[in-house]
Amino acid sequence: MPTIDAAVRHDLSDAQWALLQPLLPPPATRGRPRRWPLRSLVDGVRHRVRVGCPWRDVPDRYGPWWRVYALFACWQLLGVWVRIEAALRARADSAGRLSWQVSVDSTISRAHIHAAGARRDSTNRVAGEPDHHALGRSRGGWGTKTHAVIDQHRGVLAFLLTPGQDGDSPQMIPVLEMIRVDRPGPGRPRRRPQRVLADKAYSSK
């Protein structure tokens, strides 16, 4: 039986690309035509985020690493990734693929030793990003804590980044208040889950 390269296996399928394409920014009408296919660049971004490799180690088949990074950084500043996520989440809810029984939990991402030297005066910061870049020193060293609200069907409804030393309990209400799932047509977005599950780390809240 032939094997499939792991990286290729996780690339977007034709059906997934057809679903994603209408949500992307329209192509530029001026300037030189795009040399590298947008689909390859998007797959390059997804590969890097999935495996956590340095940008320079993104496989060449996706395009030049700097071009993949440029797409990621540009769309990050423009809020494109957030809009894509919100649109896909709304579509999943309208199709009945969200149960609204959620779990709240957190995880630590350890930072590289050089991360403590990140600039605090960058003008290319994403809207709302704090000066500390959600980087703090806990017992295990420098890191970032991700607080997430996960639907029973494994869909991420909201997440919040804090410095690694921050506790779980104080962030429970803030991350739950970040839930926002748009509805098709008019009407307010849905923000309240039916049931919330959490471990003992949140019992004091």
Where are these regions (language model features)?
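Short alpha-helical elements
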Residues: M1-K205
